[in-house]
Amino acid sequence: MSDFENLSGNDKELQEFLLIEKQKAQVNAQIHEFNEICWEKCIGKPSTKLDHATETCLSNCVDRFIDTSLLITQRFAQMLQKRGGGDL
């Protein structure tokens, strides 16, 4: 019976590891999405150097997406907490 309990503990560790790896993959995918969207929005034609306006556009673009993503994540967490508490 102790082998079964250890297996269950190992399964939990594996699940946590997989969850962390999935979150890392999601962050990487989001970064690539930001890059693509902001590149299309801010870069008219590639050159050897970014001008100030382009740098500002890229920075603002990424900041907007990060702020929006954080807001959505926070709201989703709040909804889950309410649901867990039986309020939803």
UniProtKB/Swiss-Prot annotation:
Short sequence motif named Twin CX3C motif, residue ranges: 38-61
Signal sequence interval, chain numbering: none
Domain of life: Eukaryota
Compartment(s): Mitochondrion inner membrane
Keywords: Chaperone, Disulfide bond, Membrane, Metal-binding, Mitochondrion, Mitochondrion inner membrane, Protein transport, Translocation, Transport, Zinc
Record-annotated disulphide pairs: 38-61, 42-57
GO terms for cellular component: mitochondrial inner membrane; mitochondrial intermembrane space; mitochondrial intermembrane space protein transporter complex; mitochondrion
InterPro entries on file: Tim10-like, Tim10-like_dom_sf
UniProt topology in membrane: Peripheral membrane protein
Pfam families: zf-Tim10_DDP
One Gene Ontology term from the biological process aspect of the record: protein insertion into mitochondrial inner membrane
GO molecular function: metal ion binding; protein transporter activity
Key word Mitochondrion present: yes
Family membership noted in the UniProt record: Belongs to the small Tim family.
Function field: Mitochondrial intermembrane chaperone that participates in the import and insertion of some multi-pass transmembrane proteins into the mitochondrial inner membrane. Also required for the transfer of beta-barrel precursors from the TOM complex to the sorting and assembly machinery (SAM complex) of the outer membrane. Acts as a chaperone-like protein that protects the hydrophobic precursors from aggregation and guide them through the mitochondrial intermembrane space.
SUBUNIT field: Heterohexamer; composed of 3 copies of Tim8 and 3 copies of Tim13, named soluble 70 kDa complex. Associates with the TIM22 complex, whose core is composed of Tim22.
Written domain comment of the UniProt record: The twin CX3C motif contains 4 conserved Cys residues that form 2 disulfide bonds in the mitochondrial intermembrane space. However, during the transit of Tim8 from cytoplasm into mitochondrion, the Cys residues probably coordinate zinc, thereby preventing folding and allowing its transfer across mitochondrial outer membrane.
Protein's recorded name: Mitochondrial import inner membrane translocase subunit Tim8
The organism's taxonomic lineage, starting at the top: Eukaryota, Metazoa, Ecdysozoa, Arthropoda, Hexapoda
